[in-house]
Amino acid sequence: MRSLQNSIVLLAVLVLAVLPVAAAAQPGYVALGDSVDFGIGSSTGAGWVVPFNGFLSSPSVFNAPVELLNLAVPGAETKDVDQDQLAAAVAAASAHSPVVVSLGGGGNDLRHFIVSPAAHACLKVQSCLARLNALLNEAEQRVDLALKKLREAAPNATILVRTQYNPLRGTGCAAPDLVALGDASLEAPPSSAIKGGGLNWRLRAAAARQGAKVIELFLPFAFFGDSALVGDCIHPNDFGYSLIVLQAVTAFTAP
């Protein structure tokens, strides 16, 4: 009887030895967005996404190499993120565990509106405010859809939503009325003439609906001003990108 038991155990060991072993899913980080997430303005091209990925790979977080997929495209609007980046992001997010996803967007949607000739008097013209509200509504809906699909693909993912700063605050970048419009378009509360609030309010609301965390950028960039921007009135410099990394780490580690 003992001989039979030993034979069965040996057979089981041999069977297990030849069975394919499922590879453990590798930690992953998927970034969607525009030129800020791509890293334009960084002297090394690393921007904020690459050093943040280094943080995720560190012993204090995943303690393992984290596979990075940066899908961000310079100039992308929210519609471009949904059309050109989302499908690949969903596939990558579902293939990694644990996984972190960051989503940036909306800045180009607003920038193209704010630099238009009609924008100078926008805060005083109801028809212009109506167009701005419509633009913000569309951006919010697209971000909401993207976050919903990402959450469905990776229910346990840590999702980060990057809010926008106002680059027009840089010296010589815009007339005061356009700087004010930029601020309002981003941070006007829902009770203001911009119904539903500025873009960042909407991004925070969309994040809350999908259990995502928020990378807050408006106040840090407003505080440091020119020190955080390159000379193109759009992108961060190396110091600006370090601010984004800091805010991303803060958001990631928040309860």
Feature locations, PLM:
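Bacterial N-terminal signal peptides that target proteins for export
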Residues: 1-10
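Bacterial N-terminal signal peptides
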Residues: 9-19
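Short amphipathic alpha-helices and their capping/turn segments at secondary-structure boundaries
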Residues: 21-26, 81-101, 145-156
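Serine-esterase "nucleophile elbow" of acetyl-processing enzymes
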Residues: 24-74, 101
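Solvent-exposed loop/turn segments at secondary-structure junctions
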Residues: 35-38, 73-79, 106-112, 165-170, ...
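Surface-exposed cleft-lining segments at the edges of enzyme active sites
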Residues: 74, 123-140, 186-192
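Oxyanion-hole/transition-state-stabilizing segment in secreted/luminal serine hydrolases
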Residues: 80-136, 166-167
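Catalytic His-Asp segment of secreted/periplasmic serine-dependent ester chemistry enzymes
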Residues: 164-255
